[in-house]
Structure formats: structure tokens, C-alpha cells
């Protein structure tokens, strides 16, 4: 694959954000594990202690969308901004018969949460975010939770070229797409790499190229969902 042209000259050479790793426990909670990575120690312990009741109170049970993660972050007073190219549920997802039941179950809740987001102090922005903006945020503000296609994730360190047996499916999509949340925590400009934490794995920092990240986060099914965290 030919490397894309992204002007990184304005950015410092390296950035790395220390985070306490959290591994997902089930096949549906990768996004929740990512939220845990950006909480304070006290809030993290509180959430884990009341995990079942919090999930029930939030109403997502075993089906979490990015907007659900935003409500969780707001619950624990974590400042953030949510960017997506689709407000609500993409109409194209209804055409797949296999997912009709899942979407029918979630659609009303998701649309309601989008509709009430402003009232709850959740900033939702419609549109695509350039990679330079994301890297600049890592430098100035904090980590980012990114929805990716797990089948396109790579890691230079653990030689993860495609989705591994260790990587669990988090969202019920067609075979070509497996939705999976990761936490971006830094970059190396000269090597054109980003650092990220994958909640499917034990405590480790993964590394992939900027171009690989762009492919994974802009794959059909992700809506380019991105949560920029302000720590």
C-alpha cells in the first residue's frame, strides 16, 4: 500500500500517554474497557464494583454503541468530544437481515440518546476528523477512543496482521467487519506510527502505522466514530 501524504511537520517528534490498561471480560465490552482506561482510579474502582447495576442503569445491557460510551464518560465527569459521520444509526445497516433484530432493539434508545446528548452536556459533532487533528489532540489534551474494523488492525510488536484468535468480536456486523474499540495513546512522527491499547489483550502497548489506523477507523461500519478525551 502506498503511504498517504500527511503533513506532520507542526507536531512534536513523540508523544506517549501513560494509561492503566483494562482488558475486556466479555465479547461485547471492549468499549467499556476503553472507558475504564481513561477514568481516575477511584472512578474505575467504583465502576467495576457496581458494573452490573451501572450497565443496567445506562440501558445498553450487552449492546454498546459509541454514544453509550459518551454517556458513561459523562457519568464519571470525563470531558470529551464525540465525532461521527452519522448522527443516529446509518440507514444502510437496516438492509442486512441478520442484524434487523439487533438494530430494532437498539434504534430507539440510540436515537433518543443522540437527541438528548446536548441536554446532558455531551458534545456530538457530525463530520470526519483528520488524522493530524487527532495527533494534535494526543499532544495537547489526552487519549482518544476510536471505533475500528478489527480485521484491519495491525501491530508491529505482536505481529498482529489481521484479527487474531485473541481478538474478540465486539459488535455484531457482517463477516467483513468486526467493530472494535481501541485507545490511542501516542505517536512517533518520524516513524509515522501510532501507539494504542487494545482491550482484547493483556497489558501491552501496540504499534501500527498511521495509514493502517486510517484504514481501520474509516472502514464501512465504523461511521468514523471518535471520542477525544480531555484529561
Give names to the regions the model predicted.
Residues 55, 59, 116-137, 154, ...:
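Cysteine-dependent deubiquitinase/ubiquitin-like isopeptidase catalytic cores across multiple families
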Residues 21-25, 127-140, 184:
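N-terminal short leaders/motifs
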Residues 30, 47-48, 65, 130, ...:
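Helix N-cap and loop-to-helix transition residues
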Residues 14-16, 132, 171:
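Hydrophobic alpha-helical segments, principally membrane-spanning helices and signal/leader peptides
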Residues 1-5, 136-141, 145, 149-231:
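Noncatalytic regulatory segments and standalone regulatory/sensor domains
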Amino acid at each position: 500500500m502506498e503511504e498517504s501524504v500527511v503533513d506532520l511537520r507542526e507536531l512534536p517528534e513523540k508523544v506517549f500517554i501513560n494509561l492503566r490498561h483494562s482488558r475486556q471480560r466479555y465479547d461485547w465490552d471492549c468499549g467499556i474497557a476503553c472507558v475504564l482506561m481513561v477514568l481516575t482510579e477511584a472512578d474505575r474502582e467504583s465502576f467495576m464494583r457496581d458494573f452490573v447495576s451501572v450497565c443496567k442503569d445506562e440501558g445498553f445491557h450487552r449492546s454498546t454503541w459509541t454514544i453509550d460510551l459518551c454517556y458513561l464518560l459523562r457519568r464519571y465527569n470525563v470531558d470529551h468530544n464525540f465525532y461521527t459521520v452519522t448522527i443516529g444509526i446509518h440507514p444502510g445497516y437496516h438492509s442486512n437481515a441478520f442484524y434487523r433484530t439487533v438494530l430494532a432493539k437498539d434504534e430507539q434508545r440510540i436515537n433518543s440518546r443522540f437527541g438528548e446528548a446536548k441536554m446532558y452536556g455531551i458534545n456530538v459533532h457530525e463530520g470526519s476528523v483528520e488524522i493530524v487533528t487527532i495527533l494534535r489532540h494526543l499532544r495537547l489534551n489526552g487519549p482518544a477512543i476510536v471505533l475500528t474494523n478489527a480485521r484491519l488492525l495491525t501491530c508491529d510488536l505482536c505481529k498482529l496482521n489481521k484479527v487474531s484468535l485473541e481478538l474478540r468480536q465486539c459488535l455484531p456486523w457482517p463477516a467483513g467487519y468486526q467493530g472494535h474499540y481501541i485507545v490511542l495513546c501516542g505517536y512517533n512522527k518520524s516513524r509515522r506510527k501510532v501507539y494504542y491499547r487494545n482491550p482484547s489483550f493483556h497489558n501491552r502497548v501496540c504499534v501500527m502505522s498511521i495509514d493502517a489506523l486510517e484504514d481501520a477507523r474509516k472502514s464501512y461500519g465504523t461511521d468514523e466514530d471518535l471520542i477525544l478525551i480531555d484529561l
